[in-house]
Amino acid sequence: MRLPNLLATSRGRLTAFFFLYVTEGIPLGFAAIAVATQLRRQDVGPAAIGAFVGSFYLPWAFKWAFGPFIDVFASERLGRRRGWIIVTQVLMAMTLLSTVLLKLPEQLALFTAVLLVHNTFGAMQDVAIDALAVNTLAEHERGLANGLMFAGAAIGQALGGSGVLFLSGVTGFQPTFFFVAGSILAVTLFVALPMREATPTARARAEGPSRWQVASAQMRHFAVEAFRSFLGTRGAFVGLAFALLPSGAMCLGLALQSNLAVELGLDDDQVALLNLWSSVISAGFMVLGGYLSDRYGRRRTLAVYIAAMSLPVLYLMALLQQYGWVMPVPQGGANPVVAPSALVLALWIATLAYAVAQGLMYGTRSAIFMDVTNPAVAATQFTAYMALLNLGIAYSATWQGIAIEAIGYPKTMLIDALFGLVCLLLLPWLRAVRGNVPDGGAPRRARASAAVLGLACIAWLPYRLHSGALGAAAPIFETVFTVVFVASALFLLAGGAVLERAPRAWVRAATWMALLLLALYARRWMDLLSPPLADGAALAVLVLPPAAGVLLLALAAQGWRELAAVDTQPAAAARAGAVAQ
């Protein structure tokens, strides 16, 4: 029996993209819910679990880098997007199945590395699916299709999280890996393989630059346009900071919640049911949040939603403090601690109430970024905003795990609830101006950004030399510096591409320094190296950030005339239009 090409009909296209997005949600639910729960049950500490969950989101923060390669390196026989979807889905299944024989928690580092590769393929698949949607969906189908795609992702997370936990009670945990891989491959077999893309016009390949050169040029173009758009207006620049900050308290949506669920005595079925209900509630309130924001104003409603996210966290924090449930409770002992029933009930109430507030927030936040996006580069700028949101999730999961072990649950939750409100200070400046055209302030913002990042990188040296004095707080500072290094790397990559008049040596140095800064994320695994290599790596880790800081301060002294040249004409035109009116 020949399966139908779902792309051939309107109903088929909607069905196809729903199921394709299911495969995007499965890995996230599997890691953040199912694996995190099982690791805590095996007495893996919250810090290790937080680092595991945080690393899982990193590929999504850099998914914009995959776009040029997916555009350029394509198979006309398999389909330009279909080929990438099929290949990445197969690789997702293969990488997951390769972990079946790993022993947890003994081989957690290797397990994390393999799942990081697994989720990289997931992020690549996301880019290919979105590109296919843009090319195949009719304009009147896009609204419903987007709703179905988000619903598919939510169901995928429930399948990979709650579904795996339900199943593990019958089969054990490791066999559920076959279920997850099989779910992905089922979509490959019944949806992706039968699809047929429209045949594109044949592309000449005899002359001209190589595909690698074309892809590199496209990536450079993306970086330059994103850099200029972020710095072009005050609203867009503030939006960059807003994207990097957590939008409200985050702990009840990350590993802290599953850690507590295990410690309070919930079995796998109960944890699965808790996460299933929270997913359903959050999905429903996403729609309501968007509707209310259109009616009562985005900034006003978003402020209420973000503030509301802290209330369940503070409620649960107070109950934990009241009952003396402060530090993580070891698991697997002969005499397990029995939690008061009031705390179990409080966890349910707080988690479901948090799902309401989080759903309302998600339904509104994206529209805020649309408000400050320059229409001329909308796809580039909005994609970059969405990618950076994943960086906030990654570092939040990491620091919270460290803090739980250092200062306990209540204080970690208090910090999270308060830190989640910081973004509210930026909301008044997240306001669109006429046309969102550049206002002439980009050079000034570029210099200020380079100076701040440069000083932060230089601060790494005294921190590293005296980190022992910080005690249990040192790992949290490590997380802060990781964010600084990633932000500095992105600035160097994009800024080096913009500064066309700068010496070529500077541009090359910026590129290589950016790559080395990104590589510093691997410093947590230096202990796995042999002693001579570990000593060399330790020296490199010590001196690279200050060297990057010096380079950034040098960039802060530049005039950034390239940005001024781009700004001048649109800004003048906007002012002239305003005067004419």
Model-derived regions: residue spans:
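Juxtamembrane intracellular "pre-TM" segments in multi-pass secondary transporters
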Residues: 1-11, 199-238
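Helix-loop boundary and gating motifs at the non-cytosolic
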Residues: 2-60, 237-242, 246-264, 271
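Loop-to-transmembrane helix entry
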Residues: 15, 44-58, 144, 262-281, ...
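Intracellular juxtamembrane helix-capping segments at the cytosolic ends
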Residues: 35, 123-137, 360-374
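Helix-to-loop junctions at the C-terminal end of transmembrane segments
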Residues: 62-79, 285-301, 404-405
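Cytoplasmic membrane-interface "Motif A"-like loop-to-helix N-cap segments
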Residues: 72-89, 295-308, 410, 442, ...
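C-terminal ends and interior cores of transmembrane alpha-helices
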Residues: 85-105, 307-340, 428, 524
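Symmetry-related core transmembrane helices of the 12-TM Major Facilitator Superfamily/SLC fold
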Residues: 87, 93, 175-193, 411-429, ...
